[in-house]
From Swiss-Prot:
GO terms for molecular function: cardiolipin binding; phosphatidylinositol-4,5-bisphosphate binding; wide pore channel activity. Belongs to the gasdermin family. This is Gasdermin-E. InterPro entries: Gasdermin_pore, Gasdermin_PUB, GSDME. Keywords: Cell membrane, Cytoplasm, Isopeptide bond, Lipoprotein, Membrane, Necrosis, Palmitate, Transmembrane, Transmembrane beta strand, Ubl conjugation. The gene is Gsdme. Residues 1-56 are annotated as: Membrane targeting domain. Cleavage at Asp-270 by CASP3 (mature and uncleaved precursor forms) or granzyme B (GZMB) relieves autoinhibition and is sufficient to initiate pyroptosis. Palmitoylated. One of its GO terms (biological process) is cellular response to virus. There is a cross-link at K120, K189 (Glycyl lysine isopeptide (Lys-Gly) (interchain with G-Cter in ubiquitin)).
Amino acid sequence: MFAKATRNFLKEVDAGGDLISVSHLNDSDKLQLLSLVTKKKRYWCWQRPKYQILSATLEDVLTEGHCLSPVVVESDFVKYESKCENHKSGAIGTVVGKVKLNVGGKGVVESHSSFGTLRKQEVDVQQLIQDAVKRTVNMDNLVLQQVLESRNEVLCVLTQKIMTTQKCVISEHVQSEETCGGMVGIQTKTIQVSATEDGTVTTDTNVVLEIPAATTIAYGIMELFVKQDGQFEFCLLQGKHGGFEHERKLDSVYLDPLAYREFAFLDMLDGGQGISSQDGPLRVVKQATLHLERSFHPFAVLPAQQQRALFCVLQKILFDEELLRALEQVCDDVAGGLWSSQAVLAMEELTDSQQQDLTAFLQLVGYRIQGEHPGPQDEVSNQKLFATAYFLVSALAEMPDNATVFLGTCCKLHVISSLCCLLHALSDDSVCDFHNPTLAPLRDTERFGIVQRLFASADIALERMQFSAKATILKDSCIFPLILHITLSGLSTLSKEHEEELCQSGHATGQD
């Protein structure tokens, strides 16, 4: 809840900026100015960097010398208040991007979210540089040695943080609906934050977390470039990147690099930057289609029973955000060859049922578990299959809030293959014809409404006309359309045979 609330806050006040949201409330006390933070570089363009707060400061890892005494500037940051629409009946409407979508909505109530007045503390960077000018990094420091073992992490120093000034409560509101004649139920979650003026908290069954005043909800860092002899530089300019000077280039994955290089997405722009489309709004989809057919080939050659089992586990994961985050962390650590405390903690927080699903998924994609739970003693028996699964999971984990719920609903409705066909057709000229037999399931108004909401979460606005649909990109970025294309392609590869059987069965019984 806390992670989602802080993430939503930054989307509104610092979209595309340099601030980082705090993911765990327990990390708030660790976030002191000049604390060390590691930034884990990711492999694919849509993956956001991961950050870990270390139990050390910059002073702790420097050689002896003049003690760092940072000059701290404190100021008002912003008074954060946000209004959103919640629907008070079972049927849900939703507002995504610039498009308002309603499927049987029966009234809207306006809710209010607020962290209240926020304060910013910031280090005087120029003074810090002067104080550290003759200092070097102690490369024998235990903390530094552990960071170097990770091979693809950047050492950073915390230079600013954003804090609350009053007590807040974070609540989660679950909205439910039944659609398509009761065939499926959809539950979407919204996070609401309320600041309390006098310190009192109103009891509410939806309140799940209370955060005190002076809680850090976001922070800013500055990367360091550390040379082999311990000399280091502060990376002040936008294009200047930190890291460690190595005698030889190290691969960013621990497993067979060839298993990962088959995924042809390494030369695209960083996930935080927009990819402008000049040759059509869904040009990136057309570019990626052939690559994805090759990338998901290991799924295509699996035995039908294994395909179906993997697809069934994935359906559970799509409706369980906590399980998806834990699975992505585990896959990330397996690929990196070094288990992190985040993976261990994520698995410990899972229920027995969630752990069973996580274990089942890993075993189905070529991961051999030696003990009771996944751990560093395990090994990957089929690297291409595991790389393919990690590729899909990484894309699912980067989908916006509630998008995986809509995707899971489409799996239940057996329309994944239709959605792939729809996306391909739209990538040609932004318009598709519903006379195409593969698109027949989408002629249903309620099914199309769910598809609209899924596509809107990927910044694609679908407009339905009498016998066709038209697509418009909502933002000048192709990252979310690319992620949607990857997830649909992976799920379609696993479910295609099953959906074809259902389609043939439907025709045999005279159903549409």
